[in-house]
């Protein structure tokens, strides 16, 4: 499940335990919101989704491995904060849509004995002025940069261990940000998103 990671465009890292706690929380919370349990979460009186911290912890381990320990706290700005409620050990998350973020396109897969390397293209958001079509009339999605994702095995599943920029395959001339937040009434996750287990394709 690469989208909850790619959408926040993390800097290179060689061990997820060294990553910023806010990034780990955001990715894990979005993995919950896009995962198969999203329909089971309740809502508070303000229409915010209530996500148990235990589920966030589970998604963090699924995404980033068994050694990840989250520090639970409120993150985000005042209007769209992911509010942590220690009394019920849960997050109150506003139902929001993120726009202006990249989506992943797996360009290459290299399987090894206990690991897997993915060449991941970051496809920037499309606007009316930037739409391109190929000779067959299909929409062309050209990544603006490429990253090497190393996945390692944890039992039968894989988790993300490192992210490295592929400098010689970078595509210049296209920029994107890590997301502009805007409130919507419903969250419609991609049909292709699974349970949150990061499995090798």
Which residue ranges define each predicted feature?
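Core segments of small alpha/beta cavity-forming domains
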Residues: 1-97
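Extended, non-catalytic scaffold segments that flank or surround catalytic motifs
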Residues: 1-7, 116-118, 140, 154
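Short, flexible beta-strand-to-coil junctions
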Residues: 32-39, 121-126, 152-155
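Intrinsically disordered, low-complexity segments enriched in small/polar residues
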Residues: 39, 80, 89, 120, ...
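Surface-exposed, charged secondary-structure patches
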Residues: 59-60, 64, 85-132
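Low-complexity, intrinsically disordered terminal/linker segments enriched in charged
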Residues: 125-201
């Amino acid at each position: 499940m690469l989208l909850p990671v790619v959408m926040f465009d993390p800097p290179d890292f060689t061990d997820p335990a060294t990553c910023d706690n806010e990034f780990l929380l955001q990715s894990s919370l979005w993995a919950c919101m896009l995962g198969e349990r999203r329909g089971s979460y309740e809502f508070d009186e303000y229409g915010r989704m209530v996500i148990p911290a235990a589920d966030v912890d589970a998604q963090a381990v699924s995404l980033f491995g068994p050694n990840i320990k989250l520090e639970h706290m409120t993150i985000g700005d005042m209007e769209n904060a992911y509010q942590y409620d220690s009394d019920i050990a849960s997050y109150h998350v506003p139902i929001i849509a993120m726009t202006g973020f990249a989506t992943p396109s797996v360009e290459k897969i290299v399987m090894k004995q206990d690991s897997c390397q993915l060449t991941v293209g970051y496809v920037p958001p499309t606007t009316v002025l930037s739409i391109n079509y190929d000779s067959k009339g299909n929409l062309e999605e050209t990544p603006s940069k490429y990253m090497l994702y190393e996945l390692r095995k944890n039992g039968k599943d894989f988790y993300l261990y490192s992210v490295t920029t592929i400098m010689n395959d970078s595509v210049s001339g296209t920029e994107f940000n890590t997301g502009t937040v805007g409130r919507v009434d419903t969250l419609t996750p991609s049909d292709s998103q699974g349970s949150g287990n990061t499995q090798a394709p």
